[in-house]
Amino acid sequence: MADGEVTRRSRVEVDVTGQRTEVAELVGEKAADLVLVNDDDLTYCLMGLDEASRAFVVEHIGDIESPMARTLCWSAAWEETRAGELQARGFPRRPTAVHRYADPAWTEAEGRDLLCDALIAGARGEDPDAALIFAQELTRAPLSDAAVAYLLKLVAAEPGATVGALTVDADLRWLALTALIAHSRYEDAESAEAAISELAAADRSASGTMSAVRARAAIPTAEAKRTAWDAAVSSELSNLGIRHTTEGLTWADPGELLQQFNEEYFRIAPRIWKEFSPEMAQRTLLELYPRWDVTEEHLGRADALLA
């Protein structure tokens, strides 16, 4: 790293064979901050980072000058997070692994604020396109108090209004409202339904209708989740209806409210695969898979289904 930028200072081409391949050309070289295998993405492989490079990437991925090298680091870090080799608490400085991989206690104490502060800063940036991406991602994050305040501004904004460089449209208002509902930021189900009805009255488009379906499925009550679940697995919804219903049902990973479906999923999975189109069966089963259940019983049910 020099002058705040991470640039390549040396490159060696080598064919990797076996479990260990020596690189004689680098003997005697000063150790680099970042050693990147498969730089330039010359071959298809799963690549990893050594311990020092991993720690460096956590702090400096945004400083890597080459877009290709930066992308490879993102990919390697994500694979290591999924494999349990990189703690998810290091990953929120990059994407939103907080939901499914981070220690919940750390998320509550530190991770949520860390992630939301970064996303809000991005949403307040000067580039409108980038600001929109950050704002959309914020709606998928575990919400801090600052995030709630920001999303409330988006919901209250008139269509076409600007919040910083961000132009607020109906789709963004729906995303913000759904996030607030899913995180119990409305007093009760009736208050959430009133907010949905108000926004639906202002947005009578086909997109608005589907967004209302998603928002209702996100209401954090056992009854609302049951209604959404039954609709999603009924084979009576359109493809768009299924997609929006399952998105709302699982928004914000409401594990406790979804425990009621742990066994039912495995009972109805064969029927869904038989009755739905292949694409929608795959989407529905993937979205509804009880990833919130991490018990041995869950693993047993999954093994039995696949047997």
Predicted ranges, named:
Residues 2-7, 24-307:
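Long, ordered, helix-rich scaffold segments
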Residues 13-20:
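Short proline/glycine- and polar residue-rich coil/turn motifs
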Residues 8-12:
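Short beta-strand segments
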